[in-house]
C-alpha cells in the first residue's frame, strides 16, 4: 500500500489497525521520517521508506531510527548508479529488502535499473519497476528494454547495453 506521504499519522495507524489481518507493506505512509517514527511501533505492517530516501545520510538515519523495514528506491532519487550501489550495500549489510526503480525515464534509466537490479542479493531484492510499458517507443529501437511476461532481460553489449538513436535527441537545450 503506497501512501505516497499522504496519510496523517492518525489515518496510517487506523488503516494498519483495521487491516491488521491483511498482509501488506506500507510504503511511505506519512510525509516525514519524524511522523513515521512516531507511529512505527503502533503499526501492524512493515514500513518501506520511499520519497524520503533522498540520499545516503537519510537512508542511514531512517535505519538508525529503526523505522525502515525496507525501501522503495529510485536510482535518480538516491543520486545515480554509484549511490544506488552504496545504498544496496548498506541494505545488504542490514538485511533490508529493497527495490531498484525507474523514475519515469526511457531506455537509458530502464537499462541502468535492470543492470543494478541484477546485482542485488536475490533474498533482499523486491523487484525493479520500470515505466517502459507506459512510454511509447524506445531510444534504441533494436535493444530497447522490454518487459515480457513480467521479466526483463539484462541488456547485453557495452555500457548499459543500449545504443540510443541520436536522432531522437534533436532539440538541444544547451551545448557545452
Regions inferred by a protein language model and the residue ranges of each:
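Metal-dependent enolase-superfamily TIM-barrel catalytic cores that perform enediolate-based chemistry
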Residues: 1-43
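Catalytic-core signal marking the mid-to-C-terminal active-site face
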Residues: 156, 164-176
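Shared catalytic-loop signature of beta/alpha-barrel
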Residues: 23, 31-48, 54-151, 155
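Short beta-strand elements of ligand-binding domains
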Residues: 1-2, 49-51
